[in-house]
């Protein structure tokens, strides 16, 4: 009998503990589309779990030992710890326990792969690469960390050779993914609760790009000093650089913004050619940078300039990445996932480029530990906002840390020179702030990884109701 060398087709049911999570659900969906028997549990039903049920998954609400009675394999994320009823029951039965990234890696072994890593921009970049490959008729399989508007999902099964995945560095498992093409957007000190220190994180990214095969390529943004330093350490593998700087292989030039659209040309310095007249229907230098990485991959795979330009111009974006949720009385409401100071600064700069009015930022800090460790950075990242509202910290299970609360951040912003920062004590107060501070032409940007998204999505109806 020959031992299996890849994921057997008859394995299962495969049970996902926390199947509704954005990272878990995409893998579950692709497994379903490949004909595997998939089930899972989550604490409450959501749009994501309902979609998985429609695709054939069995979904349990709540996590109990009896949920895994029929399971043969258990998939967990780093959020699932000993003491979880299903994990403990699975271990008692001797079932295989598979980390999320390990299962993603098994799927990747079926294809050639493009893996997108970086502290910020992974989800948008993954979507851009998938969009271009789709337009180039590569028909890629995709597993993303956000809902792609064009798909209505964070995953799709393609029939082509290529698979595009978001490589999450948060728990250190991303450098086990078998990437053929590895993209690195940027490297900042984040997820230190896992990595311990910045040098270890740097080594993690070096391991990630060093794992590509000799026929692969690393695609790296050398506008970022840490990534440029990483490029200097990559040996015996091909590297394509991108960015705005004059040394980048794939470089954006002649960038301008009009009506929230980025217009630019792309200098392909190794080819000695320029792709003129590119446009991207979302503002922000960071988004143009992300697009450059996708263009680099597309050209590496032989895509023509006109196909690339057409696909970029029609880019539909990703949920919660500068997502326009409504416009009331000339005031635009934006929902964005940004919760790190670098992300917040980039989003607010994009808002400045997208509106001629004022920018009102409302932020819900995510985790006391992040706010505490990056406190000075948070105090300096809102300069492009005319008005800043700070909501209570979304704890994500953490205990409060002295000096790292909502009012501390408001005081810190004022101390660092912000002219108009205040606390927002709830949805009613958010509505009050917007009514008091906005006028036609302004933009309200709600930022954070917690419940602030629900506030943003509910705000247009609240404002409309009050105006009626």
Curated annotation (Swiss-Prot):
Record-listed E.C. numbers: 6.3.2.8
Q: Which GO terms describe its biological process?
A: cell division; cell wall organization; peptidoglycan biosynthetic process; regulation of cell shape
Q: Which reaction does it catalyse?
A: UDP-N-acetyl-alpha-D-muramate + L-alanine + ATP = UDP-N-acetyl-alpha-D-muramoyl-L-alanine + ADP + phosphate + H(+)
Is this entry keyworded Membrane? no
Give its localization.
Answer: Cytoplasm
> What are the GO MF terms of this UniProt record?
ATP binding; UDP-N-acetylmuramate-L-alanine ligase activity
| Pathway terms, separated by semicolons | Cell wall biogenesis; peptidoglycan biosynthesis
Instruction: Write down the SUPFAM superfamilies for this protein, in alphabetical order.
Output: MurCD N-terminal domain (SSF51984), MurD-like peptide ligases, catalytic domain (SSF53623), MurD-like peptide ligases, peptide-binding domain (SSF53244)
The alphabetized UniProt keywords are:
ATP-binding, Cell cycle, Cell division, Cell shape, Cell wall biogenesis/degradation, Cytoplasm, Ligase, Nucleotide-binding, Peptidoglycan synthesis
A GO cellular component annotation here is: cytoplasm
What PANTHER family does UniProt report for this protein, alphabetically?
UDP-N-ACETYLMURAMATE--L-ALANINE LIGASE, UDP-N-ACETYLMURAMATE--L-ALANINE LIGASE-RELATED
Protein function: Cell wall formation.
This chain's protein is named: UDP-N-acetylmuramate--L-alanine ligase
């Amino acid at each position: 009998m020959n031992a299996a060398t890849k994921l057997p087709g008859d394995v299962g049911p495969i049970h996902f503990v926390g199947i509704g999570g954005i990272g878990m659900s995409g893998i579950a969906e692709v497994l379903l589309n490949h004909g595997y028997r998939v089930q899972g549990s989550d604490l409450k039903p959501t749009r994501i779990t309902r979609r998985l049920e429609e695709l054939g998954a069995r979904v349990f609400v709540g996590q109990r030992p009896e949920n895994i009675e029929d399971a043969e394999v258990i998939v967990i994320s780093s959020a699932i710890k000993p003491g979880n009823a299903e994990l403990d029951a699975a271990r008692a039965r001797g079932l295989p326990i598979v980390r999320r990234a390990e299962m993603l890696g098994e799927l990747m072994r079926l294809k050639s792969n493009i893996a997108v890593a970086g502290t910020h921009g992974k989800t948008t970049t993954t979507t851009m690469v998938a969009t271009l490959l789709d337009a180039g008729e590569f028909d890629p399989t995709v597993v993303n960390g956000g809902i792609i508007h064009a798909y209505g999902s964070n995953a799709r099964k393609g029939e082509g050779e290529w698979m595009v995945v978001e490589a999450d560095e948060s728990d250190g498992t991303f450098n086990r993914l078998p990437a053929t093409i590895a993209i690195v957007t940027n490297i900042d000190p984040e997820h230190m609760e896992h990595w311990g220190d910045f040098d270890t994180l740097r080594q993690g990214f070096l391991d990630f790009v060093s794992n590509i095969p000799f026929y692969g390529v690393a695609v790296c943004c050398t506008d970022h000093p840490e990534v440029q330093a990483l490029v200097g350490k990559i040996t015996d593998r091909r590297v394509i650089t991108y960015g705005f700087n004059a040394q980048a292989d794939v470089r954006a030039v002649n960038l301008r913004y009009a009506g929230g659209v980025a217009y630019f040309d792309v200098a392909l310095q190794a080819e000695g050619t320029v792709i003129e007249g590119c446009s991207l229907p979302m503002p922000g230098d960071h988004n143009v940078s992300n697009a450059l990485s996708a263009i680099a991959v597309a050209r590496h795979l032989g895509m023509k300039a006109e196909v690339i330009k057409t696909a970029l111009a029609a880019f539909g974006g990703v949920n919660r990445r500068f997502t326009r949720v409504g416009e009331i009385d000339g005031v635009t409401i934006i929902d964005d996932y940004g919760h790190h100071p670098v992300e917040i600064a980039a989003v607010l700069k994009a808002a400045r480029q997208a509106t001629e009015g004022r920018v009102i930022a409302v932020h819900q800090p995510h985790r006391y530990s992040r706010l505490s460790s990056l406190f000075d950075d948070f105090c300096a990242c809102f300069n492009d906002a005319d008005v800043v509202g700070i909501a209570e910290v979304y704890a994500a299970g953490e205990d409060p840390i002295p000096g790292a609360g909502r009012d501390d951040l408001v005081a810190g912003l004022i101390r660092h020179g912000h002219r108009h920062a205040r606390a927002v004590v709830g949805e009613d107060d958010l509505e009050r702030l917007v009514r008091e501070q906005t006028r036609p032409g302004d933009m309200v940007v709600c930022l954070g990884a917690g419940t602030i998204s629900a506030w943003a999505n509910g705000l247009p109806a609240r404002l409309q109701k009050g105006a009626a």
